[in-house]
From Swiss-Prot:
Keywords: Transcription, Transcription antitermination, Transcription regulation, Transcription termination. PANTHER family: RHO-INTERACTING TRANSCRIPTION TERMINATION FACTOR NUSG (PTHR30265), TRANSCRIPTION TERMINATION_ANTITERMINATION PROTEIN NUSG (PTHR30265:SF2). The keyword Transcription regulation applies. InterPro entries: NGN (IPR047050), NGN-like_dom (IPR006645), NGN_dom_sf (IPR036735), NusG-like (IPR043425), Rib_uL2_dom2 (IPR014722), Transcrpt_antiterm_NusG (IPR001062), Transcrpt_antiterm_NusG_bac_CS (IPR015869), Translation_prot_SH3-like_sf (IPR008991). Does not interact with Rho. It comes from the Bacteria. GO terms for biological process: DNA-templated transcription termination; regulation of DNA-templated transcription elongation; transcription antitermination; transcription elongation-coupled chromatin remodeling. Belongs to the NusG family. This is Transcription termination/antitermination protein NusG. Signal peptide: none annotated. Participates in transcription elongation, termination and antitermination. One of its GO terms (cellular component) is plasma membrane.
Length: 238
């Protein structure tokens, strides 16, 4: 015969609902992969993603121009979304740290659309647009995995890097002496990008910033060399 400890007597029903509820509440929530979640969200939406050339530095203006044309030309049934991918980074200027939004793809915007003659013309003739990436008459849609890499917020994939930056900031705020960084990179050197949207791509160093431990490299994106800023830890020597 089964026995019970405490005040519960044998034969008396034991209500486990409360105990089970407590266990469910105490169980840690399953972590959601932000990349998988974003990919599932994008897959559920209509249209394909296309990359559009724009004048560097005018990406946001081109985005606004295109969104206005979508309304004026009544092509909202074909052109659904326009994005200028950005990432939040920490910059040091005049000895002060500040968070800034930096464009992931300088000189490009992303457009989610159904490709028709009308939608193609609406995008192609937008002021500031210089063309689609891909064939002139039939642009190539961007793979969904690439869209996720460009649109996923930086913090979702680089928590370790963010933690390292926070540690450095705390050390600086506490008056601790920062270690001397030995720079092992030089302008013109070829490296491989190891992290972020351009992981595995080769790049050429164009600038070295020892104080901020950052590099400016040239990466071939859609057939055009584009400057990208990376930390020392985001590249590897070839």
């Amino acid at each position: 015969m089964t026995t019970f400890d405490g005040d519960t007597s044998a034969g008396e029903a034991v209500d486990l609902t409360e105990a089970n509820a407590f266990q469910d509440a105490a169980a840690p929530a399953e972590e959601v992969d932000p990349a998988a979640a974003l990919k599932a969200e994008l897959r559920s939406k209509p249209g394909d993603w296309y990359v559009v050339h724009s004048y560097a530095g005018y990406e946001n203006k081109v985005k606004a121009n295109l969104e206005t044309r979508v309304q004026n030309l009544d092509v909202g049934d074909y052109i659904f979304q326009v994005e200028v991918p950005t990432e939040e980074v920490t910059e040091i200027k005049n000895g002060q740290r500040k968070q800034v939004n930096r464009k992931v793809l300088p000189g490009y915007i992303l457009v989610r659309m159904d490709l028709t003659d009308d939608s193609w013309a609406a995008v192609r003739n937008t002021p500031g647009v210089t063309g689609f990436v891909g064939a002139t008459s039939r642009p190539s849609a961007l793979a969904l995995d690439d869209v996720v890499k460009f649109l996923l917020p930086r913090g979702s994939t680089r928590k370790a890097a963010k933690g390292a930056a926070s540690t450095a900031a705390a050390a600086e705020a506490g008056g601790l002496e920062r270690p001397v960084v030995e720079v092992d990179y030089e302008v013109g050197e070829s490296v491989t990008v190891m992290d972020g949207p351009f992981a595995t791509l080769p790049a050429t160093i164009s600038e070295v910033n020892a104080e901020q431990q950052k590099l400016k490299v040239l990466v071939s994106i859609f057939g055009r060399e584009t400057p990208v800023e990376l930390t020392f830890g985001q590249v590897s020597k070839i």
